UniProtKB/Swiss-Prot annotation:
Keywords: Cell cycle, Cell division, Cyclin. This is Cyclin-C1-2. It comes from the Eukaryota. GO terms for biological process: cell division; regulation of transcription by RNA polymerase II. The keyword Cell cycle applies. The keyword Cell cycle applies. One of its GO terms (molecular function) is cyclin-dependent protein serine/threonine kinase regulator activity. The gene is CYCC1-2. Belongs to the cyclin family. Cyclin C subfamily.
Amino acid sequence: MASNFWTSTHYKELKDPEEVNVVHPLDAQRGISVEDFRLIKLHMSNYISKLAQHIKIRQRVVATAVTYMRRVYTRKSLTEYEPRLVAPTCLYLACKAEESVVHAKLLVFYMKKLYADEKFRYEIKDILEMEMKVLEALNFYLVVFHPYRSLPEFLQDSGINDTSMTHLTWGLVNDTYRMDLILIHPPFLITLACIYIASVHKEKDIKTWFEELSVDMNIVKNIAMEILDFYENHRLFTEERVHAAFNKLATNP
């Protein structure tokens, strides 16, 4: 698993933390702040999840789609790449990449159900046109390694057989896609951070197991703090603030 990751395009595409929330000049001209940028990406991550729930797409595909979407916006502007089209297009592309094909017609049907605004009632041709733009923005790198891959092995290896802790850890991993962690850190470190949080919350002493892993626990704890900070600040991510951010995109500079 590790050797595959270290030689993969995913590893080569990892960013420094300060790179992932750089506001594109075209967006900055419209008054988009770093906080607006984060809000829009979070909103579109949630939108991808809602679409997937309607279509009954598995979580791994959702995770890949969110990763694609977040990667796109490390290179392209929100202004030129309309998020409400990019997000479902990334889901469509992720379905192909993860061999869980969904017809564009079905995707468009649920897009129209979730977005009543006529301005964003996209058709199949819009998805197909944006698909090529997204592929180019991704440099055609579609491989994504997820924290899910190492999670069962780590849970078993640590001796954790507590069902509630297992469920908590899986939930934490799911929530990491509401942040940019997958663009910054190797996925197995994200997995370990989630296990660390769950072990502290459930008062499970697996300190010795962590020590035997020979990983930098400072990095693991820093990732854990990022996750906890997200939960702490999540109440500030209101729909009103999301709408205000999107309204800025709609204005001319």
